[in-house]
Amino acid sequence: MKKLLLTLTMLALLGFLSACAWLEEPEIDYRAAMIEAAVHAEEAAGREAADLRNAVLDAQGSAEARIDFDELLLLSRALTLRAGEARLTDELRLCAGEVLLNRVASPEFPDTLREVLAEEGGYEGLDGVRPDRRSAETAWELLAGKRLLDRRVLYQSDGKPSGPVYATFCDRYYRYTYFCLTEHPELYEETLG
């Protein structure tokens, strides 16, 4: 009887362990992990999450955008510095970040976000900025491909417009922000469409 009871217990345990082995691993929310790492300036954790996410996307053959953690952190910091005020809308924050990414893609500006920010001049001390959550989430959306503006919008001004105005925002304190087009549209004619 003891042998039978022991055998049945072992079979039940073996069945339980086999069932556990077939359970799927829970999906990891790499987006949340990377945003959390950006907000807390945990660069090693953020890079690891980005590498894992991008490896999963590669293994799946996904067309989803690969997001570099260093770009996410840098853009998050720039958005916090330039558009991190709580009173600003998410839409305005998206547009501010989009101007920076449009510049990276433009033949009129340097080819990397860090170089664009260095040239801009208004981003001194950027590496010491701790991103806020809204800015990190906005940076993620932008790096994932979300766009609101024409890609020829290369300027943002809180004062007098610096070129042909594409969009105007007014915050609740009646401060206007203008998003302006390049003064060299001919550089973009071939690739528009």
Regions found by a protein language model. Give the residues of each.
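N-terminal secretory targeting signals
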Residues: 1-67, 183-193
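Bacterial extracytoplasmic/cell-wall-associated proteins, especially those involved in peptidoglycan
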Residues: 54-193
